[in-house]
From Swiss-Prot:
Function according to Swiss-Prot or TrEMBL: An accessory protein needed during the final step in the assembly of 30S ribosomal subunit, possibly for assembly of the head region. Essential for efficient processing of 16S rRNA. May be needed both before and after RbfA during the maturation of 16S rRNA. It has affinity for free ribosomal 30S subunits but not for 70S ribosomes.
InterPro entries xrefs: PRC_barrel-like_sf, PRC_RimM, RimM, RimM_N, RimM_N_sf, Transl_B-barrel_sf
Free-text comment on this protein's domains from its UniProt entry: The PRC barrel domain binds ribosomal protein uS19.
Protein name in UniProt: Ribosome maturation factor RimM
Upper taxonomic lineage: Bacteria, Pseudomonadati, Pseudomonadota, Betaproteobacteria, Burkholderiales
Organism for this UniProt entry: Burkholderia mallei (strain NCTC 10229)
GO cellular component, one term: ribosome
Gene of this entry: rimM
Length: 230
């Protein structure tokens, strides 16, 4: 079986998923040495642009405060319980709200219904949490949970070339779609309209083993059993 997992970089209007495997949520213990109610001035700090990680991937957004003790509620772009895994695993978050960027060390994170709730160290009350509302949340790609050999995060698939087994170029993966059963590659390619003008064509290829024969990340391509005239 081959499963595609959303990284959180897919189009935001959809509700994509990390894949078919739901992992058990992990609740982290508070960081050693942290004291309840004490504000760590470095915990939520203004972050210099040069310290933003090169492999940062947007995985969610702060939508509200949760409770009275500084917890925040988040919407995972990929859906909590699956896409929310990156939010649950990563201890270091980078937050962007407008032009301001902040770094947060997360002491606890867990699933709550269809959302993720978390406690950033230094967020001591509801007002502190509300100040983070609307922030986009990024984590390092390197902090994503490890996958099985036949699973792939969407962020690693988007941008790859798609060719068929005869070597015919079919385009590039522009986006991934979740139809509720499996992932679908949205492949774009240069085409010509009826008026003779250039346009962008589109192919929708299911990301399942019957069509996807190889994912060659080192070569930057996906090999499929698919014809150009389908």
């Amino acid at each position: 079986m081959m499963a595609g997992h959303d990284s959180g970089n897919a189009k935001r209007g959809r509700s994509p998923s990390f894949g078919v495997f739901v992992r058990k949520p992990v609740e982290r213990a508070p960081a050693k040495g942290a004291s309840d109610g004490a504000v760590d001035s470095q915990a939520i700090r203004i972050d210099a642009a040069q310290s933003w990680p090169d492999d940062a991937v947007e995985v969610g957004a702060v939508v509200d405060a949760y409770g009275l003790k500084g917890w925040v509620k988040l919407a995972a772009h990929a859906g909590a319980g699956r896409g929310g895994d990156a939010l649950l695993k990563a201890r270091d978050w980078w937050l962007q709200k407008g032009a301001e960027r902040k770094f947060a060390r997360v002491t606890q994170a867990k699933l709550h219904g269809d959302t993720v709730v978390a406690h950033p160290d230094g967020s001591v009350d509801r007002d502190t949490a509300l100040a983070l509302r609307g922030a986009r949340v990024f984590v390092r790609r390197g902090d994503f949970p490890a996958l099985a050999a036949d699973e792939f995060y969407w962020v690693d698939l988007i941008g790859l070339d798609v060719v068929n087994e005869a070597g015919v170029a079919l385009g590039k993966i522009a986006d991934m779609i979740d139809n509720g059963v499996h992932s679908i590659m949205r492949v774009e390619y240069p085409a010509t309209g009826k008026d003779g003008r250039p346009k962008t064509g589109e192919r929708l290829i299911p990301f399942v083993g019957v069509y996807v024969k190889a994912v060659e990340q080192a070569a930057g391509r996906v090999v499929v059993d698919w014809e150009a005239d389908y």
